[in-house]
């Protein structure tokens, strides 16, 4: 029986060490590898390099890839701006301020389906907003439910910065079918739309909220031009930001009221 490999123990007398040396078909007596000049063995079991190259997929040529690429007809394809434009917005927030106060709130117009829903949300948001109205908040809420004359006048700023009474534009942006028209008096404010979707197109859309209380006869005068806060149970007008007290008195005198206030029904 012929052995192809044998283990020979060599002794190095100079260093006094023993070490094994494997000899076989690929080794000669001097310990040199006869297969060093042949192809390199790869993996286990040993596979010739050229055989392994046959199983490796050839990388695609760059020219072939360029030929397969087709230009996109959609301009701006892949850009972040174009993706944001195609993505529908789920919210539409506008800033709401109580007249005379820097602190504001925001409300989502898309969370409401009608002006009535939005009007109720705004009234609940700003009711008792002032610290002096917190104590009587529950009583005032009850009076509002019973049909009190307490109302809110809502305006918005157009593109030119002018404050406009809302309600001319229907909720869905199309021609109004309900036949509503802007009311001349503050008493009818609750009967008309409160916030127009056109506010959202204004760069700095602001809704100014003015509170009207029972003691007033300024409905037709104040509705479109003057934003005032009428103190309930008191005989004076606290005008906010726009007109001085003297201007209001002159305006009342020109209307024949002689500057006096007549308590509403």
UniProtKB/Swiss-Prot annotation:
- List the InterPro entries: AUX/IAA_dom (IPR033389), AUX_IAA (IPR003311), PB1-like (IPR053793)
Please, which domain of life does this record's source organism belong to?
Eukaryota
Query: Where expressed (tissue)?
Result: Highly expressed in flowers. Expressed in roots and seedlings.
Q: Name one GO cellular component term.
A: nucleus
- What organism is recorded for this protein? Oryza sativa subsp. japonica (Rice)
Query: What does the function comment of this entry state?
Result: Aux/IAA proteins are short-lived transcriptional factors that function as repressors of early auxin response genes at low auxin concentrations.
Domain PB1 intervals: 91-194
Which conditions up-regulate this protein? By auxin.
Give me the stretches of Basic and acidic residues compositional bias.
65-88
Record's protein name: Auxin-responsive protein IAA22
Q: Which UniProt keywords apply?
A: Auxin signaling pathway, Nucleus, Repressor, Transcription, Transcription regulation
Residue span of the signal peptide, if any? none
Where are the annotated segments for Disordered? 54-88, 172-199
The text of the family note is: Belongs to the Aux/IAA family.
Q: What else is known?
A: Lacks the EAR-like motif (domain I) which is one of the conserved features of the Aux/IAA family.
Q: How does it assemble?
A: Homodimers and heterodimers.
Q: Where is it mainly found?
A: nucleus
Q: Which residues cross the membrane?
A: none
Q: Give the record's GO biological process terms.
A: auxin-activated signaling pathway; regulation of DNA-templated transcription
Indicate where this protein resides in the cell.
Nucleus
């Amino acid at each position: 029986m012929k052995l192809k490999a044998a283990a020979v123990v060599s002794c190095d007398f100079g260093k006094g060490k023993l070490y094994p040396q494997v000899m076989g078909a690929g080794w000669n007596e001097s310990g040199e590898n006869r297969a060093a000049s042949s192809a390199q063995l790869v993996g286990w079991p040993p596979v010739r390099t050229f055989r392994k190259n046959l199983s490796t997929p050839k990388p695609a040529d760059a020219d072939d890839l360029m030929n397969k690429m087709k230009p996109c007809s959609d301009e701006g394809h892949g850009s972040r701006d174009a993706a944001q434009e195609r993505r529908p917005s789920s919210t539409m927030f506008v800033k709401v301020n109580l007249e005379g106060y820097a602190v504001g709130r925001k409300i989502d117009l898309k969370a409401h389906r009608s002006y009535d829903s939005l009007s109720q949300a705004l009234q609940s948001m700003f009711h008792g907003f002032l610290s002096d109205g917190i104590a009587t908040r529950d009583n005032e809420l009850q009076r509002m439910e019973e049909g009190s004359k307490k109302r809110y006048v809502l305006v918005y700023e157009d593109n030119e910065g002018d404050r406009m009474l809302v309600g001319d534009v229907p909720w869905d942006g199309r021609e109004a079918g309900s036949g509503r028209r802007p009311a001349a008096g503050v008493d009818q404010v609750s009967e008309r739309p409160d916030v127009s979707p056109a506010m959202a197109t204004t760069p700095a859309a602001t809704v100014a909220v003015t509170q009207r209380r029972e003691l007033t006869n300024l409905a037709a005068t104040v509705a479109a031009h003057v934003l005032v806060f009428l103190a309930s149970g008191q005989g004076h007008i606290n005008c906010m930001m726009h007109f001085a007290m003297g201007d209001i008195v002159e305006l009342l005198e020109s209307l024949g009221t002689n500057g006096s206030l007549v308590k509403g029904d």
